[in-house]
Amino acid sequence: MTRSIIAVLPAAGVGSRMQADKPKQYLTLLGKTLLEHTLDVMLSYPAVSKIILAVSKDDPYISTLSLDPKIQLVEGGTTRAESVLNGLNAIAEKNAWVLVHDAARPCLQHADIDKLLAIEDKQGAILAIPVTDTIKRADNQQCIVKTEDRSQLWQAMTPQFFPVDILRDALSTGIQQGANITDEASAIELAGFRPHLVAGRSDNLKVTRPEDLALAEFYLTRNKL
């Protein structure tokens, strides 16, 4: 049976670290919001049949955007995990797989989605990059306790790619247990699965701090050349 590919974008966060007057996904670069740039990547990828966008109930910005008919809005939750779960609960398709992607990660390239979709193991897969910087563990006083061995450490990115039913069950269970679910893979891991790590690109950055905007603008400009 052919699997359908659906993208879910949690976009209900406020992005407090950006120190901006609006959620970071609505900041503008090159004439479009970060969210629109991210949606463009998914809309232009042929295998993605639908995009589910989880936004805050009182979001005053989403109505100002011209959204493609392939985009379905759902109400976001108080956490990322709840927003993603709400998106998954809106999926009725059988044999569906989901690409969960950060709304503020606009520089994703189609070649990286290709690599994820090559994975057919139901354990799923995530984009990630090997850690190259030296990693220090700190105590409560922000003093170094030890230097970590980085040889087997990877930095998780998105998209993260899983069968809808498996991810839905994993997130539901994790939320009920009060687990610290920082990404979809962490819920999958708690359910006993071992997702694949697919090497991504460092320019697939998540805009988190003010200084990230200039770098994202550079990458977006380069990608359009």
From Swiss-Prot:
Keywords recorded for this protein, A-Z: Isoprene biosynthesis, Nucleotidyltransferase, Transferase
Pathway assigned to this chain's UniProt record: Isoprenoid biosynthesis; isopentenyl diphosphate biosynthesis via DXP pathway; isopentenyl diphosphate from 1-deoxy-D-xylulose 5-phosphate: step 2/6
Keyword Nucleotide-binding: no
Keyword Plastid: no
Coiled-coil region: none
Catalyzed reaction equations: 2-C-methyl-D-erythritol 4-phosphate + CTP + H(+) = 4-CDP-2-C-methyl-D-erythritol + diphosphate
GO terms, molecular function: 2-C-methyl-D-erythritol 4-phosphate cytidylyltransferase activity
Site (Positions MEP for the nucleophilic attack): R150, K206
InterPro entries xrefs: IspD (IPR001228), IspD/TarI (IPR034683), IspD/TarI_cytidylyltransf_bact (IPR050088), ISPD_synthase_CS (IPR018294), Nucleotide-diphossugar_trans (IPR029044)
Any Pfam family: IspD
Top EC class of this enzyme: transferase
Family assignment from sequence similarity: Belongs to the IspD/TarI cytidylyltransferase family. IspD subfamily.
HAMAP family: IspD (MF_00108)
Protein name according to UniProt: 2-C-methyl-D-erythritol 4-phosphate cytidylyltransferase
Lineage: Bacteria, Pseudomonadati, Pseudomonadota, Gammaproteobacteria, Pasteurellales
